[in-house]
Amino acid sequence: TDYFLEELGVEKFALLGTDYVYPRTTNNILESYLKDKGIEADDIFVNYTPFGQSDWATIVADVVALGEDGKQVGVISTINGDANIGFYKELAAAGISADDIPVVAFSVGEEELSGLDTSNLVGHLAAWNYFQSAESEANADFIAAWKAFAGEERVTNDPMEAHFIGFNMWVNAATEAGTTDVDAVRAAMYGQEYPNLTGGTAVMLPNHHLAKPVLIGEIQADGQFDIISQTSEVPGDAWTDFLPASAVLKSDWKELGCGMYNVETETCVQLTSNY
């Protein structure tokens, strides 16, 4: 979002998502964040579509219409699955390039692009904590090992790096604890560090989230990403400050033993998960 605002000069936002909890929660946070940054409510367009949505003509027309006053429009997409193919195809059919209306996707990565005709997607963006194109010796070794195991045509992606880091942290924590007992390993996990494949170091925080860099990649014709922006490690926050209901909440399992601690009432709202 900051990249859109600061680097691309986006003034109007289309928040497009598949109709389920992740896009709705993400867009609620984004709406609040954008308004906090001075974006007017009338300059934020939100739309949800079912899984597998194939008819994008009306929605793309609505997005294009946002820019009729000359303001720069950008799309933040939490569209999932095959619906992405139709969305980008409709953008191209309408003559809209990434230079005209940039799209940054939170759900499109190397695996989703593998084997697809990416001609309609070239130049658009995606945001992850990892891209296969990251240049580091550790990443080169990781990619080589994966291709040797799964086949030369297979790609790596962000969830794979997250699993790689998490598993290695667990091994180190279990080794330190001298046991695989859950409580002992969990106590040893806090503060664990492991190298990111993009460079830098991932750190396990007391809220069970990692500190990791945020990367923005530009889609290339071969389905890979050209990394155009990378932050330093950003601490993962279990509860966003941009929604009133969660702004008062804190997650700290190490000192407070609570994942949903209300800092105003100084009480643990919930000790156990709903799931």
What residues fall within each predicted segment?
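Extracellular/periplasmic ligand-binding modules, especially the Venus flytrap/periplasmic-binding
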Residues: V21, N80-G86, F131-E193, A211
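Cofactor-binding loop segments of dinucleotide-utilizing enzymes, especially the Rossmann-like FAD-
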Residues: T18, F106-V108, N129, A221
